[in-house]
């Protein structure tokens, strides 16, 4: 850890798709936190000098062959440890308690009763609702532990060994359905680990600028600039750190939103006085995508082609050693880790070719989207960029379902522009996390001008969210939806039907592909 971080909570990853929320919650308290693989050794952890360790949840049973484990010597480090769900079971298993398969798997809300006045539940109600998600449970706590909470199906819902500062909870405090989950985590972070809470985006900027300078030295960096908030923040942060050692490459792959290419060049080459090279690669990308309809294959093709374009440009520039990308925590999470299943590959993660010529710099890969926006504001980036709609690296290539053609791209481009205009007119931009149109590869019968039509359907996707890990469909007023639908059908060629996606995440992802 860099010396600019005085206190840190370490989270060990045992495979839950949502264990990164633990890290996020702790950062919200003003305490720096990082997620690392469960394979870290006790010696490595000791060098990191965390104020506390959290063992995350995960899908395994402690008795499964090949189940995820951690170094048992963690419990000899004299550092407070909190085990969550599988983390509690693993702690129990290592310290001599007993874990068994539950007679009934427990998923969802549960009521727990607090016993006595345990540290984790200080100043919290004796009865509270928590979120359970487990198939095994602790049937016998290790010697010296006390039972701190019970529930109907889980008699040992929480446990502790106060003198060692070891704690376990069978439920998930990081999930918002646990009504006092944040308070419990605060009690661990501030009460048990004695953190102060002085970490901020200002600290993050100092830390990352120092890391960038140490990594890059006097070498040159290429930044993959798209004009979206992620790559914009990366570009400004790196430019602030190393100045003219940064060259931004903006690839117009023909998969951008309406007016986006012109806007990017104006904003960054003029507004931020950066060296920006525009590459017109539309034909190159569309030729590669010809005949391809599988979404994963499209993502991989676009990711690969991006890197090859940069390779070509770097060769022209000479002496480029690093490639900067706006990869976020959520990109890495959804692309899968050694412990988490892949949901879908992100072009910043899963689409990288093995023969890549650059070393990657990804200064945002520990941040969630809302943290990136806060960072952008701290860096002085204008609101119109900081609050720009999230836009995937593969662009409209994954908003055209099935094979990508110029005609289909134009349909999505025009319909999306109408959607954005009407959302802006209704002053809903900051109320909705993300909104866009998609073109499913389906046609339906319609009637326009007394004539039968057989044309495409446009889908509208709009969601509310905090960090992109989970989301709900946005309740856009009906009159606004009516205007959007009417304009799209009347102004966009080959569209005779508009539908609104009312699915949350999970079970759906925000993007359709």
From Swiss-Prot:
Reaction catalyzed: XMP + L-glutamine + ATP + H2O = GMP + L-glutamate + AMP + diphosphate + 2 H(+)
Pfam families registered for this protein in UniProt: GATase (PF00117), GMP_synt_C (PF00958), NAD_synthase (PF02540)
Annotated ATP binding sites: 226-232
Residue span(s) of domain GMPS ATP-PPase: 199-388
Active site, per annotation: 85, 172, 174
The keyword Transport is annotated on this UniProt entry: no
Keyword terms: ATP-binding, Glutamine amidotransferase, GMP biosynthesis, Ligase, Nucleotide-binding, Purine biosynthesis
Entry annotated with the keyword Ligase: yes
Gene3D superfamilies referenced in this protein's UniProt entry, alphabetically: 3.30.300.10, 3.40.50.880, HUPs
Domain Glutamine amidotransferase type-1: 8-198
Any single GO CC term annotated in Swiss-Prot or TrEMBL for this entry: cytosol
Gene Ontology MF term list: ATP binding; GMP synthase activity
Classification via InterPro entries: Class_I_gatase-like, GATASE, GMP_synth_C, GMP_synth_GATase, GMP_synthase, GMPS_ATP_PPase_dom, NAD/GMP_synthase, Rossmann-like_a/b/a_fold
Top-level enzyme category: ligase
Pathway terms, separated by semicolons: Purine metabolism; GMP biosynthesis; GMP from XMP (L-Gln route): step 1/1
EC number assigned by the record: 6.3.5.2
Function (record text): Catalyzes the synthesis of GMP from XMP.
Subunit structure of this chain's protein: Homodimer.
Descriptive protein name: GMP synthase [glutamine-hydrolyzing]
The organism of origin for this protein: Bacillus licheniformis (strain ATCC 14580 / DSM 13 / JCM 2505 / CCUG 7422 / NBRC 12200 / NCIMB 9375 / NCTC 10341 / NRRL NRS-1264 / Gibson 46)
Lineage summary: Bacteria, Bacillati, Bacillota, Bacilli, Bacillales
Gene name in the database record: guaA
């Amino acid at each position: 850890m860099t010396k600019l971080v005085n206190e840190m909570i370490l989270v060990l990853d045992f495979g839950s798709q949502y264990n990164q929320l633990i890290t996020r919650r702790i950062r919200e308290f003003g305490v720096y936190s990082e997620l690392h693989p469960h394979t870290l050794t006790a010696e490595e952890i000791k060098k990191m000098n965390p104020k506390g360790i959290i063992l995350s949840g995960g899908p395994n049973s402690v008795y499964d062959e090949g189940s995820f484990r951690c170094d048992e010597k963690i419990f000899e480090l004299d550092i407070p440890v909190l085990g969550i769900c599988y983390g509690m079971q693993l702690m129990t298993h290592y310290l001599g308690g007993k874990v068994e398969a539950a007679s009934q798997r427990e998923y969802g809300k549960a009521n727990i009763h607090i016993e006595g006045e345990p540290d984790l539940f200080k100043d919290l109600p004796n009865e509270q609702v928590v979120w359970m998600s487990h198939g095994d449970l602790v049937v016998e706590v290790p010697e010296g532990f006390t039972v701190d909470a019970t529930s109907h199906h889980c008699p040992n819902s929480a446990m502790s060994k106060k003198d060692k500062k070891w704690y376990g909870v069978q439920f998930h405090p990081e999930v918002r359905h646990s009504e006092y989950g944040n308070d419990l985590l605060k009690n661990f972070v501030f009460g048990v680990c004695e953190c102060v809470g002085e970490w901020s985006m200002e600290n993050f900027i100092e830390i990352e600028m120092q890391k960038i300078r140490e990594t890059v030295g006097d070498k040159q960096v290429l930044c993959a600039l798209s004009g979206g908030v992620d790559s914009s923040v990366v570009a400004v942060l790196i430019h602030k750190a190393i100045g003219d050692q940064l060259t931004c490459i903006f690839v117009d792959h023909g998969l951008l939103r309406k007016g986006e290419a012109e806007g990017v060049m104006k904003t960054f080459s003029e507004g931020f006085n950066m060296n920006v090279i525009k590459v017109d690669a539309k034909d190159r990308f569309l030729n590669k995508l010809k005949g391809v309809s599988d979404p994963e294959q499209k993502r991989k093709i676009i990711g690969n082609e991006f890197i090859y374009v940069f390779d070509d440009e770097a060769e022209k520039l000479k002496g480029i050693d690093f490639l900067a990308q706006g990869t976020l925590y959520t990109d890495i999470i959804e692309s899968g880790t050694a412990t988490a299943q892949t949901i879908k590959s992100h072009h910043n993660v899963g689409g990288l070719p093995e023969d890549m010529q650059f070393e990657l710099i990804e200064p945002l890969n520990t941040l969630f989207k809302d943290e990136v926006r806060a960072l952008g504001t701290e860096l002085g980036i204008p609101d119109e960029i900081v609050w720009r709609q999230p836009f995937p690296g593969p662009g409209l290539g994954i908003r055209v379902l099935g094979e990508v053609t110029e005609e289909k791209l134009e349909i999505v481009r025009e319909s999306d522009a109408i959607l954005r205009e009407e959302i802006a007119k209704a002053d809903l931009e900051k109320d909705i996390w993300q909104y866009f149109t998609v073109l499913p590869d389906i046609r339906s019968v319609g009637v326009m001008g007394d004539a039968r039509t057989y044309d495409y359907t446009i889908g509208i996707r709009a969601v509310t969210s905090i960090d992109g890990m989970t989301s709900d469909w946005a309740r856009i007023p009906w009159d606004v939806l009516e205007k959007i639908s009417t304009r799209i059908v009347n102004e966009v060629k080959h569209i005779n039907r508009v539908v609104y996606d009312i699915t949350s995440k999970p079970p759906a992802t925000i993007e359709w592909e």
